[in-house]
Amino acid sequence: LNYMLADWANRGVNNWTVTQVSQTVATGITEIPAGTITITVADSSSFSVAETITGGTSAATASVLSKPTSTTMNLTVPNGTFTASETITGGTSGATTTVTTAPSLVDTQNTIDIVSAIIRRDGNDISLERIGRSEYLQIPDKDASGRPTQFFLDRQITPVIKLWQAPENSTDTIIYDRLVRMDDADAAQNDMGVPFRFFPALAAGLAYYTSIKRAPERMQILKALYEEELMRAMAMDRDRPSMFINLGYRY
């Protein structure tokens, strides 16, 4: 069943798996996680946004993106693994505190793709252009400062959003819609996180994948049924923006 859900994710956007993330950018920080990475500490008030923190025991490092509360900090993807109860030190502020809960990468690792992104400043939203790996590589000055206008999604195991230009302040907010991984099928008593309109495709797909081992002689007809049901469900799940046609006249 999980193999089938992975197949659905690879086929494109499933609207019920799209979530929106808002993250305040930090001055000069060009690489942010494609999700939220939060560390819980005894006290975050003395730390500075955009500074690097270092774990006293683990030697792990990360940059501070924002401080949502007095005991939490949102981080970039850590280099290394922070551990609970260790002391962390701010590279600029010199502040120290104790880690209460080590950061988890699960939320970011569940990101499959970015559907769209904007940068918000003073209530005004500007669309961010998505570029590919080669286009990002060819940018001559990746640290040029300004309001970000482009991003590249580096789809590693822990995906990273690479911004250009480098944020010139720590007040702009990047808001993006992301496609996330569907919940794995686990205990039978738990409900599947799939809309009811996909139930026929789910049943047909399960029959097809089961037939590969149990009834290979039925595999082709079950595959055709599965594809038909899935395409019908995906067609109904797509966005339907209004379409306007303007007629022109030539004399």
Model-derived regions: residue spans:
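Glycine-enriched, solvent-exposed interface loops adjoining structured elements
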Residues: 1-35, 98-251
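Autoprocessing Asn-cyclization modules and mimics
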Residues: 12-103
